[in-house]
Amino acid sequence: MALWIRSLPLLALLVFSGPGTSYAAANQHLCGSHLVEALYLVCGERGFFYSPKARRDVEQPLVSSPLRGEAGVLPFQQEEYEKVKRGIVEQCCHNTCSLYQLENYCN
């Protein structure tokens, strides 16, 4: 497949995120190969690093205790659990992100 055809999603991203566009148009849902291509575009020669968290690293343990509430979390742990740092997929695929937010994932 021609390189220019594969670059179309990046071109669209550049057009919608250029100066003079509205804030809503600048933020995009970027998933899969579109996210990787956008990172290559934003990071350039610096490159980027992404290490997906294992599911067990972000889930709560299934231990039950009489002190735990309905959600299985101790009352003082709930706030800490909600502060888990979002990864790039959560930030840019599940939600929308800007090119400036993508730069946070560059080396």
Swiss-Prot record:
One Pfam family assigned to this protein is: Insulin
GO cellular component terms listed in the entry, alphabetical order: extracellular space
Which keywords accompany this UniProt record?
Carbohydrate metabolism, Cleavage on pair of basic residues, Disulfide bond, Glucose metabolism, Hormone, Secreted, Signal
Give the UniProt subcellular location, in the record's own words.
Secreted
Disulphides: C31-C93, C43-C106, C92-C97
Pro-segment residues?
57-84
The region annotated as signal peptide is 1-24
Residue spans making up a coiled coil are none
Q: What does this protein do?
A: Insulin decreases blood glucose concentration. It increases cell permeability to monosaccharides, amino acids and fatty acids. It accelerates glycolysis, the pentose phosphate cycle, and glycogen synthesis in liver.
Quaternary structure and interacting proteins, as annotated: Heterodimer of a B chain and an A chain linked by two disulfide bonds.
The similarity comment for this entry is: Belongs to the insulin family.
Q: What protein name is recorded for this chain?
A: Insulin
Taxonomic lineage from the root: Eukaryota, Metazoa, Chordata, Craniata, Vertebrata
